[in-house]
């Protein structure tokens, strides 16, 4: 190890001695992260710009040793080259295959990690060439080249001369090319490696693409121009008045700089002219009671910076200014003095078509969805984003945790981490420093993150010290630092995937720092069960201030199937030889195409900031709590509804909500107990808070919060049971089973004792060959698979049901069919009892008796399943909806009357087939055809059910080889109805072992499910 370190240090020394020169070895030299690259500055537009985006000539080789040389020469023959869009990723344009791995590098399994060296084999190299014209008007100006994002590195030539080199795939590489260009036609050439020594710091959990992900452009600026500007707002101790420190760096020809601060209406707030000395100058404005910036109130001022050479203004630059403070005091993160809640999500820059190439329109769409979903914070996991993202977060109000492009997860932690490698100290520091220098002026950036899953050691300690010295106005966080030196090098306790007990233990044990999980609630597939529990704790403990859900959007890549449907591809879909972690990159709150997953509604509900508490609903009295920290509720109106058995019987509106931030106020809704329908089985009250006027990105009438309250709860037991019927019923028992029939109906039981046919008025309610059977299994969710429940609970998938009793008779005018089964694999017995009256209505009891001495794994569910003909294609129900919901994910699913298509029950945006479509809290559930004829199910307790055009086996990916996609499933010509006394929850703590909370599991034991089947005939 020491010998290797000395060799690396020697290489570093040689790099310093040869600064500015190209050796051709830079891509495996950690001491050389750039050649001739300009220092990073804050983001601003200045001068005349010429985009080089578009189609470039392109050449690709599979192995690095095969790369062409001399490509920068003007007369190089590129006639045989192909083409590549810029921006554009190679793998999405026909060059190489997309690779996804979570932990480990894309060469995993084929090359042993040996930093700084990377493989030659499969290290693709892309070479680019194009011409561009320099306008004559640019003569005498400084001309700069900016390459927004190049993975993993880039060499640059202009007109046959070497310009420079850059690493760090997620920050722009900028070069001064003034001396390299000429008026008229010029040639630029780039060469990029898929992997370089910097790749060891870019082991993020995402698609491993190569190419140019952001724009390439030229800028021409006067010789007298602004080099950089730093803006530091400071609020006084009362968070009322402010100062604004402005520091500028200029070129030597600048004689004066005019500073003008304008408010949102364009009015002048303050102005000053300064004369830089040695290219530097500064001034401090005093601003009385400025409008403050926060995610709730994104008030922006504009600073105009007019640069003059003594003869006139040569350049004017603008910067948005947000007056806000960030500090940590008494174990709380404070914004403008308030302990804000971080209702966050982690977000990769990812597009289902463009990969790393994300348009401004897509960014705005993402922020709009965040606003709709009540998300107020985003972590730029795990690298600095496109500068436009921060501009938009400033404008629309999103708190940002800005994360450096440092992740070396594949190297492991402990002594192997690159955080302890001297050779990589420069790269750690450079990536953090350049991020801070670029994004320092954005009010939306409230926290710096030094990286992600890159171990802990001296390299991060140095980064922490530099950031705190340069920018004491913001806290610094880093997850791995939580566990090192008592968290000395992180200002926030920012763990990943702490469970409820661990969060509560920290929060109630006199904490010294705020707890904000940088990743929590892993949203993979059908997930986010238990999100409400996290937020019960957040709202209980002042130092627990929220976290960032992993993650915002599935990373699937779009593929259009022959029938027009879209499948979203994940790791392993492109070849069978690259390393892959399969679908583990699809953990989004939303789908790749930005469709909401059902659990998105749970996020929206738990993240809302207006809460209602019933005080006395018999008099319509409620209390409204404003959880916001900076805005009142005057922009919203409350709409309320009084419902009887799911139907609105009275409604009203309160349009003048006057509740200050963090305050409560009582209101009286326009109903009393006299309005409660005496015959109604259930009385509900719905409240919703809606925008009175259109806001940026949100339409008038958008619902920002809602809740439901039960005034009179539905009693499922009341009236449950067979109604008396004078109509005759007959039972016939023979060796092939039993038949029970009345005057207009008949049912048939197979020789195994299962209900196998149900005919009413000549209409078959059950599909041919189907049976009403017990069901203990579900198609595993991603969380189930991660916990290996499909293996651990496999005994319940298709347990043998050994018939030991089958009796059928008429008792007191009711047909009674009794069956008893032994389940030897699970050491239990199961009794099914059917009582059928003369109207063909059926009361069924499913009773399992467990062996208390046996050790048997949990069940997925305890219920029944039957198959109906496909013409029964609608569900009408009274229960929770309208989206799917489960025992631990139902806070956003309100009770109501719903009518839906069977074809819409399965959420077809899950990238892999899995359990979907269940609706809980059911009072009754009806599956009907277009004429309204079908079957109603009700029980003596609230139950859950689904009706899908797919069998459970169709959705069970454990039945099939890997790489299953919903888009390739074909709906069956049948409707599969599942209904349960209990079904396991979903969980969300993580997707690789954590189970749902204990109260939401279905443990082995005794169960009794009493339900009724009632024909619905119209």
Q: Where are the predicted features?
A:
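Accessory beta-strand-rich segments of carbohydrate-active enzymes
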Residues: 26, 38-42, 59-61, 89-92, ...
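Accessory carbohydrate-binding/adhesion or oligomerization-edge regions at the termini
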Residues: 21-108, 187, 191-195, 535, ...
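An acidic-aromatic loop/edge-strand motif
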Residues: 97, 105-118, 167-169, 177-242, ...
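Beta-strand/loop-rich accessory regions of lumenal/periplasmic or secreted enzymes
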Residues: 92, 101, 149, 194, ...
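Extended substrate-binding grooves/exosites of carbohydrate-active enzymes
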Residues: 22-43, 111, 200, 312-623, ...
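Catalytic cores of secreted or luminal carbohydrate-active enzymes
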Residues: 205-226, 564-623, 627-649, 657, ...
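Extended acidic/polar, glycine-enriched regions
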Residues: 181-185, 249-327, 677, 686-726
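Intrinsically disordered, low-complexity Pro/Gly/Ser/Thr-rich segments with frequent PxxP/GP/PP motifs
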Residues: 273-289, 646-679
């Amino acid at each position: 190890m020491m010998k290797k370190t000395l060799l690396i240090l020697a290489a570093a020394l040689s790099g310093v001695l040869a600064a500015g020169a190209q050796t051709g070895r830079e891509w495996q030299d950690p001491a050389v992260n750039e050649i001739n690259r300009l220092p990073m500055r804050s983001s601003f537009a200045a001068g005349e710009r010429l985009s080089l985006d578009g189609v470039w000539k392109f050449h690709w080789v599979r192995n690095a040793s095969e790369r062409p040389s001399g490509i920068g020469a003007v007369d190089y023959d590129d006639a045989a080259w192909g083409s590549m869009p810029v921006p554009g990723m190679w793998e999405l344009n026909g060059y190489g295959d997309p690779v996804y791995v979570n932990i480990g590098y894309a060469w995993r399994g084929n090359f042993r990690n040996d930093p700084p060296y990377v493989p030659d084999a499969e290290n693709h190299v892309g070479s680019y060439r194009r011409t561009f014209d320099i306008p004559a008007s640019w003569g005498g100006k400084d001309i700069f080249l900016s390459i927004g994002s190049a993975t993993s590195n880039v060499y640059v030539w202009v007109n046959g001369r070497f310009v420079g080199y850059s690493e760090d795939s997620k920050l722009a590489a900028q070069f001064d090319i003034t001396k390299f260009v000429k008026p008229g036609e010029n040639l630029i050439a780039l060469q990029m490696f898929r992997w370089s020594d910097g790749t060891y710091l870019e082991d993020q959990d995402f698609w491993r693409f190569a190419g140019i992900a952001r724009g390439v452009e030229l800028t021409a600026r006067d010789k007298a121009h602004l080099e950089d500007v730093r803006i530091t707002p400071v609020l006084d101790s009362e968070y009322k008045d402010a100062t604004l420190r402005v520091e500028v760096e200029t070129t030597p020809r600048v004689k004066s700089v005019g500073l003008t601060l304008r408010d949102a209406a364009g009015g002048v707030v303050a102005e000053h002219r300064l004369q830089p000395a040695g290219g530097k100058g500064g001034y401090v404005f005093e601003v009385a009671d400025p409008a403050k910036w926060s995610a709730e109130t994104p008030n922006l001022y504009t600073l105009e910076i007019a640069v003059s050479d003594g003869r006139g203004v040569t350049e004017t630059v603008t910067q948005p200014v947000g007056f806000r403070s960030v500090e940590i005091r008494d174990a709380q993160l404070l914004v403008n003095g308030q302990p804000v809640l971080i209702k966050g999500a982690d977000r990769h820059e990812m597009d289902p078509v463009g990969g790393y190439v994300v348009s401004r329109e897509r960014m705005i769409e993402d922020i709009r969805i965040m606003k709709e979903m009540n998300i107020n914070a985003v972590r730029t996991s795990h690298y600095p984003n496109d500068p436009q993202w921060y501009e938009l977060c400033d404008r629309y109000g999103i708190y940002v945790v800005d994360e450096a492009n440092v992740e070396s997860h594949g190297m492991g932690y402990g002594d192997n981490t690159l955080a302890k490698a001297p050779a990589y100290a420069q790269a750690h520091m450079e990536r953090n420093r350049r991020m801070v220098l670029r994004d320092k002026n954005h009010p939306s950036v409230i926290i710096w993150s030094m990286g992600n899953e890159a171990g802990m050691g001296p390299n991060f300690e140095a980064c922490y010290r530099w950031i705190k010295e340069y920018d004491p106005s913001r806290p610094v966080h880093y997850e791995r630092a939580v566990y090192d030196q008592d968290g000395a090098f992180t200002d926030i306790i920012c763990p990943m995937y702490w469970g409820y007990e661990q969060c509560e233990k920290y929060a109630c044990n006199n904490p010294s720092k705020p707890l904000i999980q940088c990743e929590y609630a892993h949203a993979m597939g059908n997930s986010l069960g238990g999100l409400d529990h996290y937020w019960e704790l957040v709202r209980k403990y002042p130092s627990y201030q929220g976290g960032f859900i992993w993650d915002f959007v599935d990373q699937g890549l779009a593929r259009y199937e022959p029938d027009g449907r879209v499948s979203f591809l994940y790791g392993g879909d492109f070849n069978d030889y690259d390393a892959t972690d399969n679908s583990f990159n699809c953990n989004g709150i939303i789908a790749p195409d930005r469709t909401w997953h059902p659990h998105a509604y749970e996020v929206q509900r738990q993240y809302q900031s207006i809460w209602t508490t019933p005080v006395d609903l018999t008099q319509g009295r409620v209390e409204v709590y404003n959880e916001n920290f900076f805005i009142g509720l005057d922009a919203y109106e409350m709409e309320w509804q009084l419902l009887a058995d799911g139907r609105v019987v009275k409604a009203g509106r309160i349009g003048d909500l006057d509740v200050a931030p963090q305050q409560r106020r009582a209101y009286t809704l326009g109903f009393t107990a006299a309005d409660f329908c005496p015959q109604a089985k259930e009385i509900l009250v719905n409240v919703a808070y809606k925008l009175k006027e259109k806001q940026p990105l949100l339409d008038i009438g958008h619902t920002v919060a809602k809740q439901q309250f039960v005034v009179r709860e539905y009693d499922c037991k009341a009236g449950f049971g067979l109604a008396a019927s004078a109509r005759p019923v007959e039972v016939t028992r023979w060796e092939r089973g039993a038949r029970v029939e009345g005057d207009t109906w008949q049912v048939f039981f197979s020789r195994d004792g299962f209900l196998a046919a149900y005919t009413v008025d000549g209409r078959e309610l059950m599909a041919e060959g189907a049976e009403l059977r017990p069901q203990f299994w579900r198609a595993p969710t991603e969380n189930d698979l991660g916990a290996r429940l499909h293996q651990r609970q496999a005994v319940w998938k298709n347990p043998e049901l050994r018939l030991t009793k089958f009796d059928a008779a008429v008792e007191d005018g009711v047909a009674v069919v009794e069956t008893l089964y032994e389940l030897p694999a699970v050491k239990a017995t199961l009794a099914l009892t059917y009582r059928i009256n003369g109207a063909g209505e059926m009361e069924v009891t499913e009773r399992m008796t467990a062996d208390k001495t046996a050790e048997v794994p949990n069940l997925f569910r305890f219920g029944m399943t039957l198959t109906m003909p496909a013409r029964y294609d609608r569900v009408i129900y009274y229960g929770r909806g309208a989206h799917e919901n489960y025992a631990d994910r139902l806070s956003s699913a309100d009770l109501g009357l719903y009518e839906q298509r069977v074809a819409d029950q399965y959420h077809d945006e899950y990238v892999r087939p899995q359990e979907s479509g269940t609706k809980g809290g059911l009072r009754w559930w009806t599956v009907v055809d277009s004429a309204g004829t079908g079957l109603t199910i009700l029980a003596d307790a609230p139950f859950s059910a689904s009706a899908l055009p797919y069998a459970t086996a169709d959705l069970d990916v454990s039945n099939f080889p890997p790489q299953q996609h919903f888009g390739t499933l074909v709906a069956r010509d049948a409707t599969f109805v599942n209904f349960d006394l209990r079904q396991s929850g979903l969980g969300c703590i993580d997707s690789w072992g954590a189970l749902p909370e204990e109260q939401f599991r279905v443990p082995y034991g005794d169960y009794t499910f009493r339900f009724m089947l009632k024909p619905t005939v119209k």
